[in-house]
Amino acid sequence: MGFLKSLFNGKVETPEEKKKEEESRNFDVLKYDGVKALRLGESAHAVELFTRALEMQDDLEVRDYLSQALIHVNRLDEAYEQLQQLAAAEPENVQLLVRMTDVAYMLEDYDRMEELCERAMLIDKDNPMLMVLYARACIGRGDLVNAVAMLTRAITMREDNGDARLLRGEMLLEMGDVESADEDAKWLDDHSSGVEEVLMLSARIEERKGNHEKAVEYYDQVVKANPFHAAAFKERGAVRLAIGDKEGAEADMRSYLELNPEGMDEVTGEYSAEGKEDIGRQVEQAYRNSNPFGLG
């Protein structure tokens, strides 16, 4: 390359120029290999490659990729630091603030979430996604009233906001407003088909209303769609126990424990058919310990 330059440009490439050109090539190779590793799911290797690339040259795109790789390997604080540097370079980028909020949520740093949402709202005050994120921060701090208010704003901005309706329905139910929660559940049921989270919400609402058989029907739909839904087995078992179906409750508890062995801690003593004279009593004790619906 230096010889050709001397022919056509009349000068020889200096050592500094050669070094700079080589570093540029090496940077490009590290960046390309890092992206390839990230796409192949080799996130730890991608982190190493992107880090080496940034040691050679500061590059916003590489920092973006590095933040993604760090999230994949659960190095969340470091991912947040990379996103901070990106946001400093692009302070009006709402999407970056949203990504920072997502990381703060994973870190369970709800105060930071609120701060980021407020910053983003100063830029885009009518963004319903920001309302939902703010609501999640409120929920994390136990402020359900403001969470519902933010979710209602999000729904007012976009009526078909299913995520906001589902979350609002869940929070309303937790607050004891079964009627309002039921309205959200019915809207979701009318506008979606077979969504597990919606079916679970509907089941819990029917149980709160005392409609045990209807609740079981919803739980049946959940486990039919997803035979690995541990919470559905656990909650359906509690309902079955409440209506006197100890055999069904026992079967559900067994399924729950198979899917969630840690749930064994909720059971007093060893839970197995062998060596147990009163398996029904063990089922009742298990549900009293876990108490999903406050059964006495």
Regions found by a protein language model. Give the residues of each.
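Structural marker of alpha-solenoid helical repeat scaffolds
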Residues: 55-56, 89-90, 123, 157, ...
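Canonical tetratricopeptide repeat
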Residues: 65-66, 99, 133, 167, ...
